[in-house]
Amino acid sequence: MGQCLSGNQVAGVANNGGEQPSGSNILRLPKLYTPNPLLTKEEVEVRRNEFWETCWAYGGSKEIWDVLHKVVTLLYEGNAEAATEMALAADLTIPENDISKGVYDSKGTFYEIPKIVARIPRAFAERKDSLDDEDDNMISSNDPTKSPEEHDTTTKSIASLKDAELDSSLETVLIRYSKDDKDYSIQINPNLPFSHAKSQLEEVGLENVQRFFFLGRVLQFKKSLSQQGWTSGMIIQAM
């Protein structure tokens, strides 16, 4: 993750005796974005917390990660000037003054902050709606007025959908192992539970890995990669 200001801009501020940066050098407030799929406010908060709790696993300095956490918090609060001053004090470089573009520390190490942390969702999913839908589906499936044939049709439709997911082609998943800083490639179906990747992990020598991280949170073996937000090209961290 990097600095908000260019080297010349940082030098200019220093030459002004530590005066506050001009308006053009102020960090931008978080932009809006549309998550896909939509998440509830609670889910967004959980993922953000998980990221800050595990961000050190992505490399870089823990001290810098702590500073970035404070900088992002200030930006959430609308205090761009204080966030900018903190970034300057830590000698960070932030491309285009946009924290979502990443940050570089004084040693040139890049720190990437995922959208869900660096930006603000344009909309949230409604937990109540999803629960109501589940209740409606349950009532419909238990409707005594439906004939066995109608129930069978519903069952077949669900089965067909599952078959389609299972038949989808395998995709390449890159896993970056923190112990040797190498990338390992496995071929798995992203629509199946991640636990199905056990044999592939053994083949590349990652059978002893205790935890896998993605977007700052621990991957769940009972869920598929697709369910956890993974798309082709994204890298999974292993520890």
UniProtKB/Swiss-Prot annotation:
Q: What protein am I looking at?
A: Uncharacterized protein PB2B4.07
InterPro entries, per this entry? Answer: DC-UbP/UBTD2_N, DC-UbP/UBTD2_N_sf, Ubiquitin-like_domsf, UBTD1/2
Report the Gene3D superfamilies cross-referenced here.
Ub domain-containing protein, DC-UbP/UBTD2, N-terminal domain
Q: Which domain of life is it from?
A: Eukaryota
UniProt keyword annotation of Manganese present? no
Q: Which residues carry this modification: Phosphoserine?
A: S160
According to the record, the residues making up region (Disordered) are 129-155
Keywords carried by this UniProt record: Phosphoprotein
Organism listed in the record: Schizosaccharomyces pombe (strain 972 / ATCC 24843)
